[in-house]
C-alpha cells in the first residue's frame, strides 16, 4: 500500500502546487483591484467571474475544456499523462509531453479553486491604505481558505484526475474503491483525515501570526 501511494503522490502534489500558485497569483491581485475599484464595472466583472468559478462543478469545466481544446482545436489529448510516441522522445521532449497533458487538468483546478473566492475582498478606496493596512485584515479569511484546502493539495483531485485519466493519488484511490481494494481505500481515507487535522492546526497557528488579537495570553 505504501509503495503504491509513493508512486502516485508526487504527481498530485505537483498538480496541486502549480494550481495553488497560479490561483494565488490571479486571486490576490483581482481582490485588491476589486477593493480599490469598489462598485465599478471591474468590481462587478471580478465578482461575477468568481461566483461562476465557485458555483459550477469541476466536471463541467473539465468537459468544456476537453470539448474546446481537445475535440474542436485538437491542441491537447483527451486524457492520459503521456502521448503515444512518448518512448521515442528525448528527455526534453518527454518533459514537454507530460507538461502538455497536465495543462487542462491544472486549468480546471484553478478555475474551480477556492482561492478565487479571495477575489471578492473588499476594502477602502485609498491605494496606500489598501496595500498597507486593509490587505492585512483580509489575511484571516485567506488563511482559512488556504488551510482548508491543504488536504486537497496533497490528496489529489479525484474528479479532475479521473476525468483526464491522470494517474495521481485521486485517480488511483477512485480505481481502488471501484475495485474493492479495501486496504488502499482505508489508507487514503486515513491520510485525508490526518491532513485535515494538520491543516486545522496550522490554520489556528497562522491566525495568531497574522492577527495578534486572537492570541491566547
Language model: regions and residue ranges:
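Membrane-water interface segments at the C-terminal ends of transmembrane alpha-helices
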Residues: 48-80, 101, 108
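Alpha-helical transmembrane segments of integral membrane proteins
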Residues: 9-42, 58, 85-217
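Short membrane-interfacial helix/loop motifs at transmembrane-helix boundaries
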Residues: 1-3
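Conserved active-site segment immediately N-terminal to the catalytic lysine
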Residues: 45
Amino acid at each position: 500500500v505504501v509503495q503504491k501511494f509513493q508512486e502516485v503522490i508526487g504527481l498530485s502534489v505537483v498538480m496541486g502546487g502549480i494550481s495553488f500558485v497560479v490561483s494565488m497569483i490571479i486571486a490576490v491581485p483581482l481582490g485588491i483591484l476589486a477593493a480599490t475599484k469598489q462598485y465599478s464595472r471591474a468590481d462587478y466583472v471580478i465578482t461575477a467571474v468568481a461566483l461562476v468559478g465557485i458555483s459550477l462543478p469541476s466536471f463541467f469545466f473539465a468537459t468544456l475544456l476537453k470539448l474546446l481544446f481537445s475535440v474542436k482545436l485538437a491542441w491537447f489529448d483527451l486524457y492520459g499523462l503521456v502521448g503515444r510516441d512518448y518512448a521515442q522522445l528525448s528527455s526534453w521532449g518527454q518533459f514537454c509531453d507530460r507538461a502538455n497533458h497536465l495543462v487542462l487538468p491544472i486549468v480546471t483546478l484553478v478555475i474551480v479553486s477556492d482561492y478565487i473566492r479571495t477575489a471578492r475582498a473588499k476594502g477602502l478606496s485609498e491605494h496606500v491604505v489598501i496595500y498597507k493596512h486593509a490587505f492585512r485584515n483580509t489575511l484571516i479569511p485567506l488563511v482559512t481558505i488556504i488551510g482548508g484546502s491543504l488536504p486537497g493539495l496533497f490528496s489529489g483531485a479525484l474528479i479532475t484526475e479521473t476525468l483526464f485519466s491522470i494517474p495521481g493519488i485521486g485517480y488511483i484511490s477512485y480505481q481502488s474503491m471501484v475495485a474493492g481494494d479495501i486496504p488502499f481505500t482505508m489508507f487514503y481515507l486515513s491520510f485525508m483525515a490526518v491532513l485535515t487535522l494538520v491543516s486545522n492546526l496550522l490554520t489556528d497557528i497562522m491566525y495568531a501570526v497574522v492577527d495578534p488579537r486572537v492570541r491566547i495570553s
